[in-house]
Amino acid sequence: MVFNTGAALLDAIVLAVVSREDEGTYGYKITQDVRKAIDVPESTLYPVLRRLQKGDYLEVYDRQFDGRNRRYYKVTESGRTQLAMYQKEWKEYSGKISELFEGGRLE
């Protein structure tokens, strides 16, 4: 198993955060929610959003809010498939790490 704890972990977390809202959510809220889970600079997350959009995992649209446009992100079907793969890999990865931390042997 090869769970990349760098870019893939950020991608997985962002997809998980965005997928919680059926109609999508806006960039600033995504950064705040992600930062509740992991300590990452806000400036790191906007390139992640662009990468996920470019990979067709997120779709983007603008909506008026207080007289200004606010950019929203919504998970695509491809994004949901990718998130499911990340969730499966994470479950296996974290299970093995937990087993190791608890003194078990890895098979």
Task: Identify the function of each model-found stretch.
Residues 46-51:
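Short, hydrophobic-biased segments on the C-terminal half of alpha helices
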Residues 55-69, 74:
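Beta-hairpin "wing" of winged helix-turn-helix
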Residues 84-107:
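Amphipathic alpha-helical dimerization/coiled-coil segments
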Residues 22, 56, 101-104:
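A general structural signal marking secondary-structure boundaries and capping sites
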Residues 2-44:
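N-terminal helix-turn-helix DNA-binding core of bacterial DNA-binding proteins
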